[in-house]
Regions:
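Bacterial Sec-dependent N-terminal signal peptides
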Residues: 2, 22-50
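Hydrophobic, ordered structural segments
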Residues: 76, 109, 113-166, 260, ...
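Acidic glycine-/aspartate-rich tracts in secreted/extracellular proteins
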Residues: 72-76, 96, 131-136, 197-202, ...
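N-terminal secretory signal peptides that target proteins for export/translocation
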Residues: 1-13
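Ordered, small/hydrophobic-rich secondary-structure cores
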Residues: 37-41, 46-120
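A low-complexity, Ser/Thr/Gly/Pro-enriched, surface-exposed linker/loop concept
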Residues: 77-109, 150-159, 207-240, 280-286
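Short, low-complexity cationic-aromatic patches
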Residues: 48-66, 111-125, 134, 164-192, ...
């Protein structure tokens, strides 16, 4: 019988061992690649931005369903109850995963009057739209639709970059003491905007009748951009140049339909404060 030399056996053993090690190494590498892919898989956003040809970028859920705000919810609580709640179901997401352009600190959770949790965005409760169909049933609109926009003049898609919005609230007129429900302009933080009747009735060589001590009580408003709810027209907004800036410099002030816009200092720069309507019977909330 032919015998193989010892050194040849060792050589062959080492060769097969090397091959086995190579195969094991490749298998480990492939397995490692698969694990890496799994680890790098990003979760699908549960709230993201979607761009509409007419409305621009607005908030939608994971399936692309539009999300709305209610102009009556200025105080940050859900005021859509009864039959309203059937048409405008609440949006609630306990495990928020946000798409690009959205910030976690802008979202929170509230509890409605019937004990249900609801997600809010920048202080506004979030809703879907479910109009009544031909069979008399409330059916949520399809993904990609935004048919709830401007319904009743108080429902609008949620956007991350509104500069001027509309709110609806009961307002006390400080001269007549009458309380009425009004739709009025607010800034991106929910602060009320006002107009000065004398800017309309008393022509002046200055762009505004409110100067000196007046402007300390009624600070000027300047919008940083022109993203508006759809019931407002960009062409209705403009800018005037004032000469009472810091150290005598000029500064700008936003106008709406030719009327300069102001804040009211006693509102404390707070959301849902409307203390200036009817002051002196010459100041009013800015209405669309």
């Amino acid at each position: 019988m032919l015998r193989m030399p010892f050194y040849a056996l060792c050589s062959r053993f080492l060769t097969w061992s090397g091959l086995l090690l190579l195969v094991a190494s490749l298998a480990t590498g492939v397995s490692g690649c698969n694990n890496s892919d799994d680890e790098n898989t990003q979760p699908v956003p549960t709230v993201r931005l979607e761009t509409n040809a007419t409305l621009g970028a607005h908030l939608v859920d994971q399936q692309g369903n539009s999300i709305y705000y209610f102009a009556r919810d200025l105080a940050g609580t859900n005021t859509c109850t009864g039959g309203c709640a059937s048409v405008w179901p609440i949006f609630y997401e306990p495990n928020l995963v946000l798409g690009e352009g959205l910030k976690a600190e802008d979202f929170a959770t509230i509890t409605t009057t019937n004990g249900k949790p609801q997600t809010t965005y920048k202080g506004w409760p979030m809703y879907y739209y479910a109009p009544v169909d031909a069979a008399g049933q409330n059916v949520r609109e399809k993904a990609g639709d935004a048919l709830g926009e401007n319904v009743g003049g108080v429902w609008y898609v949620m956007k991350p970059d509104y500069n001027v919005l509309v709110a609806r609230a009961t307002v006390l007129h400080k001269t007549t003491n009458q309380i009425t429900s009004k739709v009025f302009l607010i800034d991106s933080q929910g602060r009320t905007l006002y107009t000065f009747d004398r800017d309309r009735t008393n022509p002046t060589t200055l762009p505004s009748n409110c100067t000196g001590n007046c402007v300390a009580t009624w600070p000027v408003y300047l919008e940083p951009g022109r993203v508006l709810t759809s019931n407002l027209r960009s062409s209705d907004f403009g800018v005037i140049i004032r000469t009472d800036g810091l150290n005598g410099a000029t500064r700008q002030q936003t106008t709406y339909k030719g009327m300069p816009l102001y804040y009211y200092s006693p509102d404390g720069a707070q959301r849902n404060k409307v203390e200036g309507d009817g002051i002196g019977n010459i100041w009013s909330v800015a209405t669309p």
